[in-house]
């Protein structure tokens, strides 16, 4: 996860550098920056009308270019970036979809229940023609959609009862706007009553109703009262301009940010004394001033702060975000990070997509689960101080120059989605190249074949389904494993005629280990000293040792052949019993010339774990156990050299070499064996 987060941050850094590179190219070719001001006098009449269209100002009664230019200057400074965006949007001329309502419930859900936006609906009465023709309606839809106004058509033939109840007996236009200034308030429906059915007149009607919700100040005394007043709004944005009404984008934003930001329009058209505005720091007209508890911020002095709906919307969202905005941002970041798995994962193509789908599901599930306690926490009372400090931190960070660059880059890449996707793909391919190179240098094996990887995935799935891995520690000792219904499947899996289960080797570390010891055995140093002390008498000792060895061998044969004697090992329980004729402890004692008693040369069975079978030879290497060697036991009770059985199990043979019992599965322990005696029963 941290690797993917690092690559995502690296990708954002690449986008930031790439945007600065594009700015440098534009400056080199044209000699201008996006923040450079444009003189409206140098623009054509068509470009001036395009700017007014994007800002939402009517120009139908202004035939002269001079009047249009003055209206542009009164609404705000024009930058190169805003001019470029407006011309690009005009050239695109994409068709905007309009909603067709199917009935009362559909209309209620989208229009009356939507409390943070504006709807323009054309109602077509039964057996009547629409009020606005098809061509003019398409122009109307395109014009109002720039300001976030949604459109739709309600045909009364689909629900005549609802139209009669509403009083829609003739074709008309309906506009829905929030009724109060609080968030998620009631919605009121306004019906168009004008006589002229033209796009400009209808648009003026819409903007007039939207502007009526904005607090308007006409004199200095009212401005002083409002400027010094402290109310529930922490953020206020003022528009000081010489206009009849605020631009349409300003009115649309006031509805979108209802309850979060207060929009105030200061009409300075007939003001004679403007000294108070100088006292509060307003020197230029028009001015967009953001008033916060931290101070005054002049909108339009930084990169990307254009006089447009999209630019101011991103600016206000960064200062006063909703919980939904933060959730969408986290959702985008998490999914961008999850898609990095497509390039980090090496191997077959199907493997990449399987890992990608798994990562997407995991990350999105964790995101939703982590947001649930956050939403519960935000609903707790007495969190005003927490909200205040959080929003203050956002305002401090998002009014910096770096934040303005980030917002400008966000608007640039959101308007060029193909560039965003191509850079992401190129970044991912570079990650894939370096990751593949790193694995090759480390000699990591990668399944590049789809069939090979699918085969290994199927083996794993069938092994997990038919051969579940049991915990070595948690099985009860007193259970009857011979009556286990899974035993049949377990034993069928080990002959190579069926499945090759993929079993982890973690259970090996839990197997019992101990050292083989003999009764009365000395250390190696003591044995060496004893050997040096008896060096001069080696001839006589060798004779005695040979005689003693011969006697011991004869006694062994007698004990083994006697039907009344018990063997050193239980032959029914251990297949190693026939190997225990000569004790390794006895051989080691004889090699050093020891003359201990025969009882002292027996293996110390008390040090063996309970449930293990007594034997003195490893059936893997066919070597006897030496004093001090490391032993390891299996759940079935058989004992082997530790190195021998680990190599056996690590090779994929997860069963006992003697009885084929699964090496990871506990078995009902055998009865505790008693130390063996050489004395025959009477």
UniProtKB/Swiss-Prot annotation:
Its EC number is 2.3.2.27. Residues 525-542 have a biased composition (Acidic residues). It holds the Pfam family zf-RING_2. GO terms for cellular component: endoplasmic reticulum; endoplasmic reticulum membrane. It is found in: Endoplasmic reticulum membrane. Keywords: Endoplasmic reticulum, Membrane, Metal-binding, Transferase, Transmembrane, Transmembrane helix, Ubl conjugation pathway, Zinc, Zinc-finger. Expressed in different tissues including hippocampus, cerebral cortex, heart, kidney, spleen and lung. Expression is increased in hippocampus and frontal cortex after chronic treatment with antidepressants. The keyword tRNA-binding does not apply. Residues 525-549 are annotated as: Disordered. A zinc finger (RING-type) spans 618-660. It comes from the Eukaryota. It is an enzyme of class 2 (transferase). The chain crosses the membrane at residues 6-26, 326-346, 366-386, 411-431. GO terms for molecular function: ubiquitin-protein transferase activity; zinc ion binding. It is a multi-pass membrane protein. GO terms for biological process: ERAD pathway; protein ubiquitination. It catalyses: S-ubiquitinyl-[E2 ubiquitin-conjugating enzyme]-L-cysteine + [acceptor protein]-L-lysine = [E2 ubiquitin-conjugating enzyme]-L-cysteine + N(6)-ubiquitinyl-[acceptor protein]-L-lysine. InterPro entries: RNF103, Znf_RING, Znf_RING/FYVE/PHD. Pathway: Protein modification; protein ubiquitination. Acts as an E2-dependent E3 ubiquitin-protein ligase, probably involved in the ER-associated protein degradation pathway. Interacts with DERL1 and VCP. This is E3 ubiquitin-protein ligase RNF103. It comes from Rattus norvegicus (Rat). The gene is Rnf103.
């Amino acid at each position: 996860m941290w690797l993917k987060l690092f690559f995502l941050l690296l990708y954002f850094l690449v986008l930031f550098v790439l945007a600065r590179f594009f700015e440098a190219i534009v400056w080199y070719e044209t000699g201008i920056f996006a923040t450079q001001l444009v003189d409206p006098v140098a623009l054509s009449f068509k470009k001036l009308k395009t700017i007014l269209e994007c800002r939402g100002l009517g120009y139908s009664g202004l035939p002269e270019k001079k009047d249009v230019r003055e209206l542009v200057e009164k609404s705000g400074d024009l930058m190169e970036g805003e001019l470029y965006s407006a011309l690009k949007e005009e050239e695109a001329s994409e068709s905007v979809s309009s909603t067709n309502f199917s009935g009362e419930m559909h209309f209620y859900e989208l229009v009356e229940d939507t409390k943070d936006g504006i709807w323009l609906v054309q109602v077509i009465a039964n057996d009547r023609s629409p009020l606005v023709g098809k061509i003019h309606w398409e122009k109307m839809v395109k014009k109002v959609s720039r300001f976030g106004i949604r459109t739709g058509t309600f045909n009364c033939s689909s629900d005549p009862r609802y139209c009669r109840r509403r009083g829609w007996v003739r074709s008309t236009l309906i506009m829905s706007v929030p009724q109060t200034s609080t968030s998620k308030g009631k919605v009121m429906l306004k019906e168009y009553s004008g006589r002229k059915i033209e796009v400009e007149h209808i648009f003026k009607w819409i903007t007039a109703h939207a502007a009526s919700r904005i607090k308007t100040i006409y004199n200095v005394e009212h401005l002083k009262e409002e400027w010094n007043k402290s109310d529930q709004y922490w953020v206020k944005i003022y528009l000081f301009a010489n206009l009849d009404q605020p631009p349409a984008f300003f009115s649309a934003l006031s509805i979108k940010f209802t309850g979060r930001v207060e929009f105030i329009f200061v009409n300075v058209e007939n003001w004679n004394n403007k000294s108070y505005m100088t006292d509060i720091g307003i020197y230029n007209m028009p001015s967009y001033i953001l008033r916060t508890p931290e101070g005054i911020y002049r909108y339009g002095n930084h990169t990307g702060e254009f006089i447009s709906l999209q630019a101011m919307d991103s600016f206000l969202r960064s200062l006063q975000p909703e919980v939904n905005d933060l959730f969408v941002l986290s959702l985008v970041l998490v999914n961008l990070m999850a898609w990095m798995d497509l390039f980090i994962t090496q191997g077959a193509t199907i493997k990449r997509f399987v890992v990608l789908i798994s990562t997407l599901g995991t990350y999105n599930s964790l995101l939703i689960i982590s947001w649930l306690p956050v939403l519960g926490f935000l609903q707790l009372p007495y969190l005003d101080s927490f909200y205040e400090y959080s929003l203050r931190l956002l305002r401090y960070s998002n009014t910096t120059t770096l934040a303005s660059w980030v917002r400008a880059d966000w608007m640039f890449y959101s308007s060029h989605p193909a560039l965003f996707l191509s850079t992401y793909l190129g970044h991912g391919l570079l990650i894939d190249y370096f990751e593949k190179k790193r694995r090759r240098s480390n000699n990591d094996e990668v399944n590049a074949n789809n069939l090979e990887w699918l085969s290994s995935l199927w083996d794993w799935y069938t092994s997990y389904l038919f051969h579940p891995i049991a915990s070595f520690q948690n099985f009860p000792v007193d259970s009857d494993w011979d009556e286990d219904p899974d035993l049949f499947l377990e034993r069928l899996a080990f002959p190579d005629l069926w499945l090759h289960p993929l079993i982890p080797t973690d259970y090996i570390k839990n197997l019992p280990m101990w050292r083989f010891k003999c009764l009365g055995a000395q250390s190696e140093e003591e044995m060496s000293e004893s050997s040096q002390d008896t060096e001069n008498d080696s001839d006589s000792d060798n004779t005695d040792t040979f005689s003693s060895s011969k006697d011991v061998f004869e006694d062994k044969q007698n004990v083994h052949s006697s039907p009344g004697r018990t063997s050193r090992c239980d032959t029914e329980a251990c297949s190693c019993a026939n190997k225990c004729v000569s004790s390794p402890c006895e051989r080691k004692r004889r090699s050093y010339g020891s003359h201990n008693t025969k009882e002292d040369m027996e293996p110390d069975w008390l040090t063996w774990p309970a449930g293990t079978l007594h034997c003195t030879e490893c059936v893997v290497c066919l070597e006897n156990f030496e004093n001090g060697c490391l032993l390891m036991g299996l759940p079935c009770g058989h004992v082997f050299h530790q190195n021998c059985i680990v190599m056996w199990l690590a090779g994929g043979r997860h069963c006992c070499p003697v009885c084929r019992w699964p090496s990871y599965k506990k078995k009902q322990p055998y009865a505790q064996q008693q130390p063996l005696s050489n004395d025959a029963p009477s």
